[in-house]
Structure formats: structure tokens, C-alpha cells
Amino acid sequence: MRHRKSGRQLNRNSSHRQAMFRNMASSLVRHEVIKTTVAKAKELRRVVEPLITLAKSDSVANRRLAFARTRDAEVVGKLFNELGPRYQERPGGYTRILKCGLRTGDKAPMAYIELVGRPEDAEAVEADDSAE
């Protein structure tokens, strides 16, 4: 019985899942939007949101914790220098999942997961406002 066991298995063993979400979290922080399956996007939220919350208070200890979870110095720098200050006033909910149809090969439901309030979103909204 798998009572009270949270998280999705995604047909992978635990080390594969951990490595996959570490890579996906790094990609999401680096590019601020990625395309993946809906199930992986929902699980990725559980990895990325605590990282951004950690980045809101900049300290050596928090940077080391973030590095231990991502293993990427560039990503840690972006987390603490850009994303932490950007989301300082937001109490959680840093990601958005937008469903985008089915994958061609196997009809898996796909989605974009993006960081809320990324600069491209703000520019697009301003362009729409000026066009009206």
C-alpha cells in the first residue's frame, strides 16, 4: 500500500528522478520557461518554489543549500541576484503551468511551466496596452 506517500514516481527510480528534477529546475531558473509533460511540471513546482523562497534571504548558508540542490553555480547566482529580489514581496506561487496540447509521438499532455512576472511577460503586457 502506498498510503501517505507523496509525489509521483514517473516510472523512474529515485536517483533518476532526483537528477531529472535537478536538471529541470536548473533549466527553468536559467530560461524562465520550459516545455514538459503536465505531470513533470506539477512535480517540478515542488522543487523550484522552495529554491526561490530560499533565495529571498541572501546568505552564505542559503547559497550553499541552493548549490547542494542544483549543483550549478550559474543557477545559484541567478537565483540570489535576480529571482530572490524579484519575488521579495510575493508570498509563494512563483510558477505558472500553461497546458499546450498533446505531444506528437505518444499523445502525452504537455505544458509550459514558467516563472510568474518574468520580464518578457511584462513587456508583452505593456505592448498590448500601448496598442489599444
From Swiss-Prot:
This is Large ribosomal subunit protein bL17. Gene3D superfamilies: Ribosomal protein L17. GO terms for molecular function: structural constituent of ribosome. It holds the Pfam family Ribosomal_L17. Part of the 50S ribosomal subunit. Contacts protein L32. InterPro entries: Ribosomal_bL17 (IPR000456), Ribosomal_bL17_CS (IPR047859), Ribosomal_bL17_sf (IPR036373). Keywords: Ribonucleoprotein, Ribosomal protein. GO terms for cellular component: cytosolic large ribosomal subunit. The keyword Ribonucleoprotein applies. GO terms for biological process: translation. Belongs to the bacterial ribosomal protein bL17 family. The keyword Cell division does not apply.
